[in-house]
Amino acid sequence: MKWLAILQLVLLSFGQGALARELSTCFGTTADGRLENGWRLPLSGENFQTYSRVASLAGRTYVHSTVHRVILEAYAKTREARQDTIFVYGETGLRTGGEFKPHKTHRNGLSVDFMVPVRNEESHSVTLPTHLGNRLGYDLEFSDRGQLDNLRIDFEAMAAIAKFEVVPQPIAQMSR
């Protein structure tokens, strides 16, 4: 019984440290800046996923801690309103910011690429196809009507996520 109490204390202490992540600070601009204590976005959640597990694990999905919170809160609120919609986020930046090819921005943790949510011909929400053949989704071109092969842009889902208010701290408090 004594070993169980010790194990609980160890796990509790470890958990406290894992939760006590340092907040981020951004410097400069999105085009000429850097980031301290960048936070990596999760690979996936109930209604979202990264554009590429490999690129994410290679360190291309770090953001400012406030941006991290805002994105996850927006996905959570959207999940409540649109349970069947899947979202895909793209590139964001490096853990310490700085140059981020091929982008001219994404340098201080405040830039995020969001891929459009799409539906197939049965009107089911599906993930945007991202692979090397289409430069991980960045080379996809939809028609003026939002069509690409058997996919159509889910404009209703885009409008739904735009309705939610997530109030971040002022940028002045985020950067130096």
Question: Where do the model's predicted regions map?
Answer:
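Bacterial N-terminal signal peptides
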Residues: 5-13
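Active-site acidic/histidine clusters and adjacent loop/turn architecture
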Residues: 22-89, 150-175
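Active-site-proximal beta-strand/loop segments in catalytic clefts of secreted hydrolases
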Residues: 90-94, 115-118, 176
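Positively charged n-region of N-terminal signal peptides that target proteins for export
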Residues: 1-3
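Charged, often glycine-rich, active-site loop that binds/positions anionic groups
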Residues: 95-109
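Short, compositionally biased strand/turn segments
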Residues: 6-7, 87-91, 95
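Mid-length scaffold segments of soluble, non-membrane domains
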Residues: 105-142, 149, 153, 157
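Sec/Tat signal peptide C-region and signal peptidase I cleavage site
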Residues: 16-20
